[in-house]
Regions:
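Bacterial Sec-dependent N-terminal signal peptides
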Residues: 1-27
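Central antiparallel beta-sheet cores of small beta-barrel/beta-sandwich binding domains
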Residues: 25-137
Length: 137
């Protein structure tokens, strides 16, 4: 086989393996509060970060906001700090700056701050109510 064809085959194989590895490995459900407002949050953990959604209980499940984030400190740190951006219909709505240590063997609960688009900051306290391996589904 010619070296050029071999390189292309290896590149495609590497891309396919990388794509498969990047699939969500674990899903989490949280219930708690942002300030005084009850919320339900779902997150899926990837190698490159997390995605999910959140809804305010008073608004109902049909009014979900999209979440996408990444850890912002060194993985060797015993406490992982996450920056999670919240959007609604593709528009920025706010940012979570929280501690969540599920991926380093720590607490699965989320605590920290949420700052909305107007600059108002709220305490975040979320308890993990469900953890599911998405690889097994």
């Amino acid at each position: 086989m010619k070296p050029f064809k071999l390189r292309i085959i290896l590149l495609l194989l590497f891309a396919a393996i990388s794509w498969n590895i990047s699939y969500a490995q674990t899903g989490f459900e949280f219930k708690g509060t942002i300030g005084k407002y009850p919320v339900v949050m779902y997150l899926q953990g990837y190698i490159s970060g997390i995605v999910g959604d959140i809804y305010y209980v008073s608004q109902g499940k049909d009014k979900k906001l999209y979440l996408e984030g990444e850890y912002i400190n060194d993985l060797e740190n015993p406490v992982l700090t996450w920056k999670i951006n919240e959007t609604y219909n593709g528009k920025y709505n706010g940012t979570f700056n929280v501690e969540w240590n599920a991926f380093v063997g720590g607490s699965q609960d989320i605590v920290g701050k949420y700052t909305n688009i107007k600059g108002k900051t709220y305490d975040v306290n979320l308890k993990c109510t469900k953890c599911v391996s998405l690889r097994e589904q």
